[in-house]
Structures are given as C-alpha cells and as structure tokens.
C-alpha cells in the first residue's frame, strides 16, 4: 500500500505519471489471479484515463494541484456516478436508470483531480458488517488468502468490502466508503488499513443510496491517518490540509473496559494490550473507563436500530415486487423495520439523546477513548456463507463495538495495531461528535508511536 502523500510526491517529482499509476491499478484489477472481479462491480477505465491524462497535463503546465490530483481512487457502489447505474451490491437495481449526476462526495473528489477507477463491491444495500455478497462474489481479505478456493479465504469485513480490498491490493490509493454501524472501520480493521468515521453530517450524503438517514456517514479507507485526513477535508469541502500530529505526552486516553472487551480473540487481546503499553510508554496517560451505558445500547436497538425502519421505508415497494432477488439475509434484516411501531421509533430517539448526553459527560475528562475495533480476527468465508446461524452471530460480534459510536454519533479511527505477519487487528480511537479535526491530529500521534513499536501501520 502507498500513502497519498507518497504518491503525490512521486507525481510532483516526475518519477511517475498519473496515467502510469492508473494503468498499474487497471492491470491489478484485470489480473485473473487477483481479486479484481470480486472487488469491483464496474471499472470506469475510459473516464479514468481521461482524468489521469488531464492531471498529467495540468501538472506539466505548472498548475498547483491538490494532493489527490491524478491519484487512483475507488468509490463504493452506493454513490451515484453520472451516467452509471448505482447497484448498491444488489441485482435488484441493475436495470434502474443511470444517475443523472455524481453524488456530492464524488463531485468533490473529481474537483480535486482524483481519478475514479471504478465502483466497488459491497454487502448488499450496506446491511451487514461481514462483506459477504452472493451476487457479485465476496472479495478475499488480503490476509491468509486462498488462491485455490476463494471460499477458504477470509472475509474482508463490510459493508465497504471492495473499498478496503481495492486499497490493500493496490487497485486504488484511497477507497471511498460509508459507515452506518461500522462499515468503514470494520473492513479497515480486518484488512490492516486505516479507516475514518466522521461525525454524521460532516460530509454530505447527497447522491448516496441510504441505509439510515439518521446514522449514515461517509469516510475514507487508506494507508495512513494523514491519507484519511486529507481525504476527509476534501470530502467535507475544506482546504486539503493535514492537521499537525499531536504529541502523546500528557494526552488523556480512556481505555474502555467491560462489554467492549468481552469475548476477544487471543490475537485481538494481545495486539490491543501491546498497543496500550506502547502508548503509555510514549507518554500518554491511560486510565480505565467503565461506561456502563454502552452495554444497554444493544437492548435499545434490538428491534433493528434506526436502520431497519428507515431502510424499510426506502425498500418497501421493491420488497413487495422483487424480494426473491434480494440476499435473504439482507431482506430479513430490512423486513424487521416493518414491525417497528411509531412509539418505539420515538422512544429510540429519546434513548439516543439521553445516551449521547451521558457519553459526553463520561468523555469530558479524556482526549479520546480506546477499544478494539472488532473482537475477532477475520473468519473464513465458507464458515459463514453456509450457515445462517454463524453468519448472524459473527455479524453481531463484528458490529458490536463500532455501532455503539454510530448510536452516540462519535467520530474516530480504526488503526492497525498488529505486528507484521500477524492477523490484522484494529485499534479504535473514538471521540464525541464534532471533534473530527482533533481526532485526526491525535490519530497521527498514535500512529507514529505504533509504527515506532513495529506495528503494521502501512506507509
């Protein structure tokens, strides 16, 4: 994996052209021994070549360019691209009319000169944290990949599965994803990437197919925190500056205990413990936090969270007409929303507001909270693909920690904290909503300490 800053430096120095970078990415996508056919639902080669050539021409003419200019980027296939049909990883939408305009997030990427390589595969309608897709195939996690039998490979995490693997496999430098319950942070954790979930509303969802209008947020998956920071600012319509890294000396980091650490795989527990020791040795002040309200949130959301009723409203007619074309596991989750009563939805809004107030008070003494992004290492695709029980159990486990902070409208990162050669493990660094810039600055300081300790932070 390469960082945006590294690629931009090579482009500026003339060591490589945007067209050369793009052709390398397209070759990886087309490689029959690779994951390209499962990573992308569509490849936009012609428009990407035009964008790469335009970036090269501007650079040659001495035009001042953004850090993303001429850089290959992938876009999750729930963002509208003008002239293309948005499928959201489903067969149901294949024959729908093409989008009349780009989603606003895509408009901002194009305005910054990014080269949109293609639309990436995802969990159907973004409604699972596993990344399994029966319609377009499931991209294999880069860790412990099986060349002989893709089902013996490991899940990439979801729902932004293709976005993650596109970056991990060098098909893109940044992948644009969405995070409603963890769909950026889960695949980032399982694939050894960095993923950023911003405060809801920081980046416009205009032109993005919704899962939950209450919870949907848009975020990048990339190699480093700086990559996420510059991408986030471009997506938010801000100047593409990277905040200066915060030194760890004296930072107050709360380590969440209890519910969020139940049932950790040994590899996750070991990597998380090593990360905590590393940050403490670097001068951060770590203190255990027991915020009991977290374990109550799954009870509040047991009937389908905000996602089920809000998603059902969007899908109601499609399900009546074409339910047989849905992945049954996804259709079943959406249909839970049919049974949510108005008073239950209103009560959930009230419970969320109260939980956010309680969380803000508990968070006040800290600069960030730390916890494992997910409790498990990536299981094999075959273990989940053939068992509804296993699928449901692991999906709940994968979403457990990340979804808490969608409910609380936090902002934060998943950073790789494993050693090279080990199963990827993510360290989640979270803050309350509205602290995005400080979170990205703090994340760079944490990333530097982890890198110095030999953790597998890509550069």
Question: What are the residue ranges of the model-derived segments?
Answer:
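An N-terminal boundary/leader segment
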Residues: 1-49, 57-60, 281-282, 452-459
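Serine-dependent amide/ester hydrolase catalytic core
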Residues: 8-9, 57, 104, 315-407, ...
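Structural helix-boundary/capping segments
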Residues: 12, 111, 169-262, 273-282, ...
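Acyltransferase
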Residues: 15-23, 53, 103, 267-290, ...
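Immediate post-signal peptide segment of exported/extracytoplasmic ligand-binding proteins
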Residues: 55-72, 246-254
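Short glycine/serine-rich loop/turn segments
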Residues: 68-215, 258, 371-391
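Short helix-loop capping/hinge segments that flank enzyme active sites or metal/cofactor-binding pockets
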Residues: 68-91, 153, 250-252, 305-360, ...
């Amino acid at each position: 994996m390469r960082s945006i800053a590294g690629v931009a430096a090579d482009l500026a120095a003339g060591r490589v052209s945007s067209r050369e970078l793009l052709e390398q990415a397209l070759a990886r996508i087309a490689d029959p021994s690779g994951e390209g056919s499962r990573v992308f639902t569509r490849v936009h080669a012609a428009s990407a070549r035009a964008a790469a050539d335009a970036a090269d021409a501007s650079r040659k003419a001495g035009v001042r360019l953004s850090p993303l200019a001429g850089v290959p980027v992938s876009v999750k296939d729930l963002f509208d691209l003008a002239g293309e049909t948005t499928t959201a990883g489903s067969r149901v939408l294949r024959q729908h009319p093409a989008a009349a305009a780009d989603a606003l997030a895509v408009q901002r990427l194009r305005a910054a000169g990014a080269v949109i390589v293609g639309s990436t595969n995802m969990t159907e309608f973004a409604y699972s944290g596993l990344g399994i897709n029966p319609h377009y195939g499931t991209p294999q996690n880069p860790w412990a990949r099986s060349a002989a039998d893709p089902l013996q490979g490991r899940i990439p995490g979801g729902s932004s599965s293709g976005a993650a693997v596109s970056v991990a496999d060098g098909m893109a430098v940044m992948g644009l994803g969405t995070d409603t319950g963890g769909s950026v942070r889960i695949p980032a954790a399982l694939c050894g990437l960095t993923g950023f979930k911003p405060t809801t509303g920081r980046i416009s969802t205009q032109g993005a197919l919704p899962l939950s209008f209450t919870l949907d947020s848009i975020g990048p998956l990339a190699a480093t925190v700086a990559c996420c920071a510059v991408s986030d600012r471009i997506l938010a319509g801000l100047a593409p500056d990277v905040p200066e890294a915060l030194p760890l000396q004296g930072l107050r980091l709360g380590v969440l205990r209890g519910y969020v650490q139940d049932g950790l795989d040994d590899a996750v527990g070991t990597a998380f413990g090593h990360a905590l020791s590393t940050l403490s040795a670097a001068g951060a002040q770590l203190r255990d936090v027991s915020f009991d309200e977290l374990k109550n949130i799954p009870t509040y959301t047991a009937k389908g969270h905000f996602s089920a009723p809000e998603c059902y409203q969007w899908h109601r007619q499609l399900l009546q007409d074409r339910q047989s074309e849905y992945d049954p596991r996804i259709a079943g989750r959406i249909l839970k929303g049919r049974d949510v009563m108005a008073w239950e939805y209103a009560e959930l809004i009230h419970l969320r507001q109260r939980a956010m107030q309680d969380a803000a008070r508990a968070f006040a003494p800290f600069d960030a909270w730390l916890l494992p992004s997910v409790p498990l290492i990536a299981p094999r695709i075959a273990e989940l693909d053939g068992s509804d029980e296993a699928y449901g159990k692991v999906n709940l486990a994968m979403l457990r920690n990340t979804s808490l902070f969608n409910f609380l409208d936090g902002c934060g990162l998943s950073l790789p904290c494993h050693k090279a050669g080990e199963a990827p493990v993510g360290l989640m660094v979270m803050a309350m909503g509205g602290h995005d810039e400080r979170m990205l600055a703090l994340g760079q300081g944490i990333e530097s300490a982890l890198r110095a300790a030999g953790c597998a932070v890509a550069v």
